[in-house]
Amino acid sequence: MSETQNSTSQKAMDEDNKAASQTMPNTQDKNYEDELTQVALALVEDVINYAVKIVEEERNPLKNIKWMTHGEFTVEKGLKQIDEYFSKCVSKKCWAHGVEFVERKDLIHSFLYIYYVHWSISTADLPVARISAGTYFTMKVSKTKPPDAPIVVSYVGDHQALVHRPGMVRFRENWQKNLTDAKYSFMESFPFLFNRV
C-alpha cells in the first residue's frame, strides 16, 4: 500500500510541477527577456521624468497668492488681486500690463466676473508698443457657497482654448512674448496696412 501511495503522490507532484512550469514564464525565453527589458526601461524612464519634474518644481515653484473669499469679493479687489498675482509670477520687469474689468455675467448658480489683462513690451526700437497680447481672467463667485469659501479663478490667453488655474499651472511669460512676436511679424509682412499715420 505504501508503494501505491508513493506512486500516487509522485504522480500528483509531477502534475503540479508540469502545471506550474506551464504557467510560469520561461526565463530562458528570449521574447520574455525582451519584454522584461522594455518594461524595465519604461519604468526607469518614468522615474527619471518624475524626478526631473520634482527638481524643476523645487527650482521654480508654482507661484500663487491667497485669493479672496466670496464674502470679501468686489470688482476693485479683483483688479488688485490680479495685479498682485502678476507681480509675483512675472519675473521680467520689462513687461508692462494693465488690468481692466470687462463684464459681469449672471448665471443660474453664480456670477462670472471677467477681466482683461493687456501685455506689452517696450524695446529700444519701439519705446511705445503698438502691439499687445492679452489674458482673460474669470473670477467665479457662487451664489450658494458660504462667504468664507474661496472664489474660483481661471485664465485663458488670447487666441487660446486651454483654461488655466493659478497655482495649478505656471504662468509663462513666453506665451505673451510668442503672441506679440507673431503679431509684429504679421505687421511687418503687410506694412502698407499698418504704417498709416
UniProtKB/Swiss-Prot annotation:
Q: Region (Disordered) spans which residues?
A: 1-29
Q: Which GO terms describe its cellular component?
A: axoneme; cAMP-dependent protein kinase complex
Pfam family membership, one: AKAP28
Spell out the coiled coil positions from the record: none
Region annotated RII-binding sits at 35-52
Q: Tissue specificity, please?
A: Present in cilia (at protein level). Expressed in tissues containing axoneme-based organelles (cilia and/or flagella): trachea and testis. Highly expressed in airway cilia.
User: Which Gene Ontology MF annotations are present?
Assistant: protein kinase A regulatory subunit binding
Subcellular locations according to the entry: Cytoplasm
Q: What is the effect of changing L43P?
A: Abolishes RII-binding
The record's listing under InterPro entries reads: AKAP, AKAP_28
User: What keywords would UniProt list here?
Assistant: Cytoplasm
Q: List the disulfide bonds.
A: none
Q: Where is the composition biased (Polar residues)?
A: 1-11, 19-29
Q: Fill in the subunit field for this protein.
A: Binds to type II regulatory subunits (RII).
Q: PANTHER family, alphabetically?
A: A-KINASE ANCHOR PROTEIN 14
Its annotated function is as follows: Binds to type II regulatory subunits of protein kinase A and anchors/targets them.
Mind telling me what this protein is named?
A-kinase anchor protein 14
In its UniProt entry, the species of origin is given as: Homo sapiens
- Upper taxonomic lineage: Eukaryota, Metazoa, Chordata, Craniata, Vertebrata
